Amino acid sequence: MRLSRAFAWPLLCSIATTVKAPFATAPSDCGGHYTDEYGRIFNYAGPKTECVWIIELNPGEIVTVAIPDLKGFACGKEYVEVLDGPPGSESLDRICKAFSTFYYSSSNIITIKYSREPSHPPTFFEIYYFVDAWSTH
């Protein structure tokens, strides 16, 4: 589920200022399986062209993904995809441009995939994830 931008921007600002490090991921990670209640995913600048991050919270919890800004992405050469569940699940969105966008999982798992063409250098991005305290099953 995608949240409207009018509501998302103030919420993201409040989250970004109240949720501070330590975050679960590091800029050099190309994928991984994370179980922390919140974290931040950075772009990967190494030779791999596809990275997959699986975020798995406790059963009954909903994962919220916040993408503050994707700018500078070359659409057609790189994108971020948000999957509603483990790899292979339904895609919530495949994006190459975004500003203040939120996604919610329908279960306790969400997958973030970054893909780029081998000849294209990676563009900086950061994505936040956290447990949605208001939307548990």
From Swiss-Prot:
The keyword Ribosomal protein does not apply. Residues 1-21 form the signal peptide. Residues 30-132 form the CUB domain. It holds the Pfam family CUB. InterPro entries: CUB_dom, Sperma_CUB_dom_sf. PROSITE patterns: CUB (PS01180). Disulfide bonds join 30-51, 75-96. The keyword Signal applies. Keywords: Disulfide bond, Signal. SUPFAM superfamilies: Spermadhesin, CUB domain (SSF49854). It comes from the Eukaryota. This is CUB domain-containing protein. It comes from Homo sapiens (Human). The lineage of its organism: Eukaryota, Metazoa, Chordata, Craniata, Vertebrata. The gene is SPADH.
